[in-house]
Amino acid sequence: MREALILLAFAGYTLAQPAPHGYIGAGGCASSNCHGGTTASPVGESRILGNEFAHWSVSDKHARAYQALTEPRGKRMAEVLGIADATHDKRCTICHIAGSPEKTRSDGVACEACHGPAEHWLGLHTRQNSHEVSVRAGMIDTKNLEIRAKTCLACHLGVPGQEVDHELIAAGHPDLAFELDTFTAAQPAHHRPLPNAVRQRAWAVGQAVGLAESMRLLQSHAGKSSPEFSDLECYQCHHDLRSESWRIQRGYAGRKPGTLQVNAARIEMVRALLAVLAREDRATLDSAVAHLNSATTVAAAKAIEHIADSLAARVQKQDIDAAAVLRAVAGNIQRIADDGVNAAEQATMTLDALGTNTEATAPLYDYLEHPSLYRPSEFVALFQKAAAKQ
């Protein structure tokens, strides 16, 4: 399920497209004495692997983002949406062909989608101690976890005017699930292995930035004649209306049955993080969340955005007590499970990212492959079993 979940997300929008000028294309990075080698350089010999281009072209799903537009699913989506050619429609290409100049558009999401148009920093970044000057010349500073997360989320979640909205999902686009550390590892990573502390910070920053960005999207949709359903938990509507439904058995504490529920997946993970790092902000978050599905949604979303932005800046600079965060998630797993499949996905990826036994999460990923069969009690039992093996 882990691979399936990530494949679905990569089949959809991927990474944000910066300014349309200055791209050189992936081939410009493929020199054998730069990033185009066939084997990784020994540790200590170079700060880079040297075979990043091969990693991307052979194993990275980003390299097949253009291809997704030409396959049966992509063609059928274009037909349903009334798009003549998805490979030339900005709604699709803004993310599926990010980082590729026109002449190499079939490369899909290439190096410069993540690292920035390289025209002015390609030569600079080969020199020692050149990172800061390269960033000033247009390189995206992926060492900065907030910037890295925002770069990914611009397409793996969306920003105003560039998003997978309900129309696209209804036409066949997969819903987007994203967690920074899990997706970085599955890309696959084309850098030296990172210390656990850095990976844990990546998870924390990714959760905080993801929540802030989702709240900005929610605010951008306010005031429209109808809600943007992609802001919501999908399966509150897309489920069987059977009398024995777990939703009916659970009840609707604090809201009327049928009230639309904002997707709370990242809220629950940030709750767990605040329980460990900033308890004083936890109460503020809970108060704002209580008003997300009311007439004061915009003000509540703004308050949550502020909390999440502050948290992202804070956790980028400090180590995370991963075990304590996992205890906070596990202690609240019933409520997380009751929030639905999207929240369960984030809890699973959190256990994968912060735990010590990745294999133990496999049954959780397998279970979430079939969201129509999802039952909170079953997910809770599987999560507790996997958590006990960490």
Language-model segment annotations:
Residues 1-7:
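Sec-dependent signal peptide recognition
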Residues 331-342, 347-390:
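A cross-kingdom marker for long, charged
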Residues 27-35, 93, 112, 153, ...:
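Cys/His/Pro-rich metal-binding microdomains
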Residues 77-113, 129:
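Post-signal peptide N-terminal segment of secreted/secretory-pathway proteins
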Residues 22-30, 88, 107, 145-149, ...:
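Short metal-coordination and nucleic-acid-contact micro-motifs, chiefly zinc-binding Cys/His arrays
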Residues 38-79, 113, 117-336, 372-381:
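Primarily the internal scaffold of c-type cytochrome electron-transfer domains
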Residues 11-14:
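N-terminal signal peptide c-region/cleavage motif recognized by signal peptidases
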Residues 18-37, 224-233:
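Local sequence-structure signature of Cys/Sec-based thiol-disulfide redox active-site neighborhoods
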